[in-house]
Regions:
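Extracytoplasmic small-molecule ligand-binding "clamshell" domains
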Residues: 31-103, 237, 248
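Periplasmic-binding protein-like
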Residues: 45, 122-129, 200-243, 259-266
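Acidic, polar ligand-binding/catalytic clefts
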Residues: 68, 77-140, 211, 216-217
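A ligand-binding cleft/hinge motif common to bilobed small-molecule-binding domains
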Residues: 104-112, 159-162, 185-186, 190-219
Length: 266
């Protein structure tokens, strides 16, 4: 009898240990958790002006400033973690990051795997070409090589619209848009498709190299902040402070700092 009892106790202890290990596999942050635990924000740190490294190797940007103010109001420390943007959903689902906050388009496909904040900025995918290019229409891009970022809304659109993508000789995918623009400048590709805000900002820094066309790829979208499906509490708390920041003019001031005017969703 003692042997049976000991065996049962051993099995119970083993099950408890397994359950304990399983609960540690995913550590998600919640707004109501300990105030000393940082909220980890995943971003592409080569995505100016939303999030990027400055000359001092510090991560800065419009979204970074928004996140700093929001977490300050939540009385929580914040940690910005550079991630592979093409693996962003896995980073969020695993709990390695608590939030994706980096010019992320809200799409129906992404809603299947993430919770989103309310939209805070409008966006569209636009084609940029070399400054001396005569490309002005989609027809002129037929048989040309275009570049975009892996994991981007443009990539999703082209993957889901093969007839549209087939008109191009090749769609090259890059880890970040900076590499795509470098290839465009060096003549390795004919055009770059990117978020209009990001492309315009980059173009302003390289006015002698690139120009924006009127060619829009796909439908207009909105930027939103993404959270894990099971982290409704954090989503709601961040949304609450974002609403406060909009009402008191803080978001408008941050927009004016980075874009010269308030271009956020009213």
């Amino acid at each position: 009898m003692k042997k049976v009892l000991l065996l049962c106790m051993s099995m119970l202890l083993g099950a408890m240990l397994v359950a304990g290990c399983g609960s540690e596999e995913k550590e998600t942050s919640s707004a109501t958790g300990g105030s000393d635990k940082p909220i980890v924000i995943g971003l592409d740190d080569s995505y100016p002006p939303m999030g990027f490294k400055d000359e001092n190797n510090e991560i800065v940007g419009f979204d970074v400033d928004l996140a700093k103010e929001a977490t300050k109001r939540l009385n929580r420390p914040v940690e910005f973690k550079a991630i592979d943007w093409s693996s962003k959903e896995a980073e969020l689902k695993s709990g390695r990051v608590d939030i994706l906050w980096n010019g992320l388009d809200i799409t129906e496909k992404r809603k299947e795997n993430m919770l989103f904040s309310d939209p805070y900025m409008k966006n569209r995918q636009v084609i940029f070409v070399p400054v001396n290019s005569d490309i002005k229409s989609l027809d002129q891009l037929k048989g040309k090589v275009i570049g975009t970022q892996s994991g981007s809304t443009t990539e999703d659109f082209l993957d889901n619209n093969q007839d549209y993508a087939a008109q191009f000789a090749e769609v090259k995918k890059y880890g970040d848009y900076i590499d795509a623009f470098m290839d465009l400048e060096n003549g390795r590709i004919d055009a770059v498709v990117t978020d209009e805000l990001i492309g315009t900002y980059y173009m302003q820094k390289h006015a002698d190299s690139f120009k924006e066309t009127d060619i829009v790829v796909g439908e207009p979208t909105d930027f939103g902040i993404a959270f894990a499906k099971d982290n409704q509490a954090l989503r709601d708390e961040v949304q609450k402070v974002m609403n406060e920041m909009k009402a008191d003019g803080t978001i408008a001031k941050i927009s004016e700092k980075w874009f010269g005017k308030d271009i956020t969703t009213k």
